[in-house]
From Swiss-Prot:
Leucine-zipper: annotated segments: 153-184
Disulfide bond annotation, renumbered to this chain: none
Gene Ontology MF terms in the entry: DNA binding
Keyword Transmembrane helix (UniProt): no
Lineage per the UniProt record: Archaea, Methanobacteriati, Methanobacteriota, Stenosarchaea group, Halobacteria
The protein's name: Transcriptional activator GvpE2
Subunit structure: Homodimer. Interacts with endogenous GvpD, also with GvpD from H.mediterranei.
Effect of residue 180 to D/L: Still activates transcription
GO cellular component: cytoplasm
InterPro entries registered for this protein in UniProt: ArsR-like_HTH, Tscrpt_reg_PadR_N, WH-like_DNA-bd_sf, WH_DNA-bd_sf
Note in the entry: Encoded in a 14-gene locus called c-vac which produces cylindrical gas vesicles only in the stationary growth phase.
Binding site for DNA: 143-148
């Protein structure tokens, strides 16, 4: 893998890409898996509802796409209020990665990925709204409902749009904060005597 990274870096240098880029194996695996998911969305859902559904715990072995992120301290540092604010996007990503999930699995996934305790009273209305909006399909089984992505491209575009807005906001806020720090250090407040 190191040879591939070195080859990629040298190709970037030869192409005149002027950037200090660092690669890590989990980042590349996640990016490659995401690219494969976006290119081949046919496996994300099926047209026929399943006849039998078995709970599958979210593990690194079962879902290599999220392996680098499971039990990650940075993700566990995200506040429950932020998770609740963006629960639609979180649910769409988790259901897309899984290819389908029931509510119990999604609650466990959110807890495992983010350390957040989202209540069923918060999550289930959002699943219904996503289904009503045509982003999810819901199959009713004997003891549970299974949610699948109805239109993978629409789901990806929705999440991508929200993520872009969040990144733009975060970069803008961080830039303003950096300017404030620079201005304060350049113009110290007079001390009271």
């Amino acid at each position: 893998m190191d040879d591939l990274l070195a080859e990629l870096k040298s190709e970037m240098d030869a192409a005149g890409v002027d950037a200090d880029v660092e690669f890590s194996l989990p980042t590349l695996e996640l990016t490659a898996a995401l690219d494969a998911t976006i290119d081949d969305t046919s496996q994300l859902y099926t047209d026929d509802p399943p006849h039998h559904y078995t709970d599958t715990p979210l593990t690194g072995d079962d879902l290599p796409l999220l392996e680098a992120w499971l039990d990650d301290a940075q993700l566990h540092g995200v506040g429950d209020d932020i998770i609740a604010e963006y629960i639609d996007e979180v649910l769409l990503v988790l259901i897309t990665v899984r290819g389908g999930a029931c509510g119990k699995e999604l609650l466990q996934d959110v807890r495992r990925l983010f350390g957040a305790d989202v209540s069923p009273g918060t999550m289930y209305p959002h699943l219904k709204q996503l289904a009503d909006a045509g982003l999810l399909e819901m199959s009713e089984l004997t003891k549970r409902k299974v949610y699948r992505v109805a239109d993978a491209q629409a789901a990806i575009e929705h999440v991508d749009s929200v993520v872009l807005q969040l990144l733009t906001f975060a970069v803008g806020l961080q830039t303003i904060m950096a300017d404030c720090i620079v201005n304060q250090s350049a113009d110290p407040q007079p001390q009271d005597e």
